[in-house]
Amino acid sequence: RVVILHYGVGRVGGFWFDQTIFFRDLMDKMDKDVAFVILVCDDVNGDRAKEILKPYSREKLPDGTSRVKFLTVNAKTSRFYPWARDPYMILTDNNGNLIFLDAGYNETPFPITNFHAIFANAKSQVGSIHRGGGNIRTTNEEMIIGMDTLLGLKIFPRWIQYENVESLYSLAKDVDRENLPAFKARFDAYCNFIHKVLAPDKMMIIPGKKDFFERLEMENFPFTRKTVWNTGAQPAYHTDVYLGLGHIDESGKRVVFIADSKSGVEIAEKISPEERRQIEQNLPALLETEGLTAAGVPLTKEQISERFQWEKHKLLDLCIEKSYTIAEKLDKAAEHLENLGYHVVRIPYLPNGLDNRGRNDAAIGIGFNYSNVLTEVYGGIRKVYLPEFGFRQLDEAAAQAYRDAGFQTVTINGLIMPGFTTGNAHAGLDCLTSEIRFPVRWAKKYYDRD
């Protein structure tokens, strides 16, 4: 078992957080036979991260190699993408060698071409699969893929030069009822190709597809995006924001965890407005302990409180309001998967209400998201690593939902800052990690040296 992490500057609106806080907590709390591959940049910040994490690199795996291995990438830390889930997907060839399929991110240094320095015989391939790994969830049996990944596929001009480059999303805007069957057939053809490229041996599931085409037929799907980003064709901007994967239950069904904003509202509305203000008042102190900075300068809880003014905005009240607007999409995704035979477990969720609407322009809130987490399922082990946001009733309800599903809960520090967002929810632990759950072989140098 291997966890890949990116040491970049996690930044939102000029505010930065120190990723080594959650790196260290994750390594302390995960089993000692879990290996970590940490991508760092060739600059002073990368050197600093390696120095902080040096004690963990001295730990040994059962195979005798270092538990933590660093891979240097050609980029500056300030420009390095910290969300390890998104930029590539990990496949294997017929010989079991790793393939890192780049997901079309244009930022430096992608595609990353030196994974072979860590993993024996690893290959890099450049793909054009829109939206990245965070929008695709896989198990040994299935691949669950978000609609935006498919709607974002480019329709390139063939031999006629004056044809415009479009996406399936832009084509769908002009589809009328008469031409809908033809467009659906075209959409399915592209889906079949992606299925073959990514995981031909797995069942492909697209939770938002049925709802999208039903709304398209009724001509009430709102095409409001210039790019395929948060189009409304899926419950959240990435599948892993609202959907997590569990084990096979006693009846043979795959357990899936789906965010539930209705239950989040029920919990939030049970407490008094005064209690909600107290929770908002306590958030800056938690962010201070997580190392929140403004352009690298550490902030005090008083400065954080003055900048964000969550009490004044009544953040939790806005979160309650926002919950009602997205509940139906989440419920439909849960219903769709349940109808396919999955064992659906709903996890309380309170989306950020300080979104990018005009009256909240440039404001940053927090999405109380417990679905974007890291689960471990192997042998008899059932563990979930999740955040605590300081909203005690919601924190406890989310943890209890996982415990009721048979999982041991492990809280990880350093995850409130990744919850910062101007949208419904931001990234979490699943976004920050890319894991390999099958045997790998290290590059020869590790066995020679260690």
Could you tell me what each predicted segment is?
Residues 1-450:
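The feature marks the mature, well-folded catalytic cores of soluble enzymes
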